[in-house]
Swiss-Prot record:
It comes from Homo sapiens (Human). The chain crosses the membrane at residues 26-46, 55-75, 100-120, 140-160, 198-217, 238-258, 272-292. PROSITE patterns: G_PROTEIN_RECEP_F1_1, G_PROTEIN_RECEP_F1_2. Residues 47-54, 121-139, 218-237, 293-319 are cytoplasmic. The lineage of its organism: Eukaryota, Metazoa, Chordata, Craniata, Vertebrata. InterPro entries: GPCR_Rhodpsn (IPR000276), GPCR_Rhodpsn_7TM (IPR017452), Olfact_rcpt (IPR000725). This is Olfactory receptor 13F1. The gene is OR13F1.
């Protein structure tokens, strides 16, 4: 087969989960459920943050950004797969594949930057409460959020530009359900050492370094909490950090497990199932964690329900 630049390929074919015909319907149902919960949960968090003035704080600005990128990340990966399952085609155009790969890289990278910024926000709120309004003013918060998006989008562009010139070995069959960059590299028949180096550098910048910043922030937070004399004060401080810590563990745990998986013959099959967790489960659980663990969100929802004359029986469930 003659090598060709992958931009010359008009259509790519996904193998998806066709190797597992007995569980395809189950996978489709689970993915559809996860996607719907992701959409509803994250739209709910964004909406309630906008509607309730008490939630117009740095923490909820960052949380709204997290919800927004979770919607885009999940939509870029799951919605084409669900559409292909219904239509039975399992194909994607070059432009669609490139867009899907870029969105996946950009949203994942942005979250890697945004999570340590959220940890820093919690650090300032607990360790420097009197200076918090000055340090985390509106301008600073907007700059942090914009910087996170710019960093994620630029690193994704660098990775994309390193892959586009590569030549394929006449093969356009992707052993995945999405245009994941590692799955695309499996089709390349030229040396990919430069691309692998670029990806390694970006991975180090976006995984271990943010994790280190988060650990440092929470080390200071823990030290400050232990110095709080009242039990109520400690409980309140812990509650403001628990939800973020759960999201951090969920996100980085999944990301690291994808990078530290065993190098086996069927590693591509492992990649597909782990990508489902990364693209479906994590964005789905984020709004659930923040809603159930956050008293302010519950209070805001109660106010919204009362304002719109909803059934008081439903309000009592939130108590």
């Amino acid at each position: 087969m003659f090598p060709a630049n992958w931009t010359s390929v008009k259509v790519f074919f996904f193998l998806g989960f066709f190797h597992y015909p007995k569980v395809q319907v189950i996978i489709f149902a689970v993915c559809l459920l996860m996607y719907l919960i992701t959409l509803l949960g994250n739209i709910f968090l964004i909406s309630i943050t906008i509607l309730d003035s008490h939630l117009h704080t740095p923490m909820y600005l960052f949380l709204s950004n997290l919800s927004f990128l979770d919607i885009w990340y999940s939509s870029s990966a799951l919605s084409p797969m669900l559409a292909n399952f219904v239509s039975g085609r399992n194909t994607i155009s070059f432009s669609g594949c490139a867009t899907q790969m870029y969105l996946s890289l950009a949203m994942g990278s942005t979250e890697c930057v945004l999570l340590p910024m959220m940890a820093y926000d919690r650090y300032v709120a607990i360790c420097n409460p009197l200076r918090y309004p000055v340090i985390m003013n509106r301008r600073t918060c907007v700059q942090i959020a914009a910087g996170s998006w710019m960093t994620g989008c630029l690193t994704a562009m660098v990775e994309m530009m390193s892959v586009l010139p590569l030549s394929l070995c006449g093969n356009s069959i992707i052993n995945h359900f999405t245009c994941e960059i590692l799955a695309i590299l499996k089709l390349v028949c030229v040396d990919t050492s430069l691309v692998q180096l670029i990806m390694l550098v970006i991975s180090v910048l976006l995984l271990p370094m943010p994790m280190l910043l988060i650990c440092i922030s929470y080390a200071f937070i823990l030290a400050s909490i232990l110095r709080i004399s009242s039990v109520e004060g400690r409980s309140k401080a812990f509650s403001t950090c628990t939800a973020h810590l759960m999201v951090v563990v969920l996100f980085y745990g999944t990301a690291l497990s994808m990078h530290l998986k065993p190098s086996a013959v069927d590693s591509q099959e492992i990649d597909k199932f782990m990508a489902l967790v990364y693209a479906g489960q994590t964005p789905m659980l984020n709004p659930i964690i923040y809603s159930l663990r956050n008293k302010e969100v519950k209070v805001a929802l109660k106010k919204l329900l009362i304002r719109n004359h909803f059934n008081t029986a439903f309000i009592s469930i939130l108590k």
